[in-house]
Amino acid sequence: MTETPPLPMRMVTFAAWRDSAPHAAGAPGRHYVTLAELLVRLGGYGLGLTWKARLPDEQPRVAFARMAKESEGAGIPTLELLAMDAPHLQAIDADFEGYAGDELRLTLREFDSSSWDVRTADAWVLSEIRRHYPDARPMTADEWNATH
């Protein structure tokens, strides 16, 4: 029996800063899409993954260093990651890699605090990202490599 070759990874990018709906005070605002928000958008798909954080040393918050350290080795399950402080904060230039066992399934890249880049072979994940973030556009491999 022949093994099915893995699907190629595809990438999209979208703006990290979003216009918010008016609040009780009536004024619209802007909000930053956090890692926590993205994980919630992935729903059950994300729950089965463990995460490894790749962050530069100069992150402004101690919470990111803690997350990176704890994600070494086997990684952090999604629910444990969501319970930490860092996923609710804005990072600068960070990769969050989601694994199913030893297989990398998804990379969420926070680039320059201005965009999120998503890389996966899973069409459902890309569809969900596009549904929640309609400005998501395809990226080339060269564009992906330039943001690292």
Which stretches of residues belong to each language-model region?
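Acidic, proline/glycine-rich low-complexity IDRs
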Residues: 106-148
